[in-house]
UniProtKB/Swiss-Prot annotation:
Stretches the record annotates as Disordered: 44-68, 251-287
Subunit composition and interactions: Interacts with TEFs. Interacts with IRF2BP2.
UniProt record similarity statement: Belongs to the vestigial family.
Annotated positions of the Phosphoserine modification: S58, S271
Function: May act as a specific coactivator for the mammalian TEFs.
Entry protein name: Transcription cofactor vestigial-like protein 4
Residue runs in coiled coils: none
Signal peptide start and end residues: none
Residue stretches of biased makeup (Low complexity): 275-287
GO CC annotation: nucleus
Amino acid sequence: MLFMKMDLLNYQYLDKMNNNIGVLCYEGEASLRGEPRMQTLPVASALSSHRTGPPPISPSKRKFSMEPGDKDLDCENDHVSKMSRIFSPHLNKTVNGDCRRDPRERSRSPIERAAAPAVSLHGGHLYASLPSLMEQPLALTKNSSDTGRSAVERQQNRPSVITCASAGARNCNLSHCPIAHSGCSAPGSASYRRPPSATATCDPVVEEHFRRSLGKNYKEPEPAPNSVSITGSVDDHFAKALGDTWLQIKAAKDSASSSPESASRRGQPASPTAHMVSHSHSPSVVS
């Protein structure tokens, strides 16, 4: 019983000493700022109001009498009292009507500014501010990767804007964009051309876009140098490919086609050899 009384007296003595030190610290700050000493009374009352509940059990008997739940509750109460001491100047400013923002508060994000009053208002429980933080909207800030890209790259990623891609990114060998390989041309030029490239292929979707955009100024794509032209007749094609052989085949075919016609005019049936000759030349024509 004597030890209990001594522990209680020791606790009360330490409590008074802490309160006196806190009051002296606040009075010293008030004197440095030139404020009256009466403003420290609400702070002292606020500090004393947070000390609620019976005094803790003596350290010599704590390990025998306290349960794990009581220990957690005691630690939580100590944490809440420390947080209330930290945020008590902010509460004092709002009570006195001083709502001016601190320069450090201006640099905070909206979520951090919302977290500070939430922690001070919910002094009964430290984690009461977590739901309010979850309900706050996200900060609408620009992504850091967007700052490294140029304005042309950001504009090309917009689907509503039709722009000209760079020369290395184009997959068509003919582009009619004003921004060509040699730079920008005048806006009033009649047509847009660029030299053909044998390595790239032409995209029909891109060509259709330029055909509709340029109208009469649009020029058809020029064929590649190694491409085969399909202009001219079939006879010219085989004459260039086969030479004299094609002329012989064509002469034999003409003679074979004329002999059945002459025989039918005389009323005589056509000889089977003529049909054989005409059929024998047909595979060579196909080849």
